[in-house]
């Protein structure tokens, strides 16, 4: 069983953002979604405002990419990248 945590979802596609929230609620009931935003700059502001433990980040977003958001949050939260683009897979781990 996974323990309680606070999470941020950053995904520019509204339907995908909502679907991810639903799946996370079903799979990890003790996870509190503190913010769900549609662009990278809003994600950075939400990190500062809410201090999430886990970030679920789309890689390709307006404002700032998920990679930029991950660098911004480095050391403050665990990062899970959510993307359908194969070409970003290697960059996400660098």
Question: For the regions a protein language model found, what residue spans apply to each?
Answer:
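A generic structural motif
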Residues: 28-34, 77
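CheY-like receiver
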Residues: 45, 49-94
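Non-catalytic signal-transmission and effector/linker regions of two-component phosphorelay proteins
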Residues: 1-8
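Conserved Asp/Asn-Gly motif in the active-site loop of CheY-like receiver
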Residues: 34-41
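Generic structural signal for conserved hydrophobic packing positions in ordered secondary structure
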Residues: 20, 37, 89-92
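Charged docking surfaces used in two-component/phosphorelay signaling
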Residues: 18-26
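Conserved acidic carboxylate
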Residues: 11
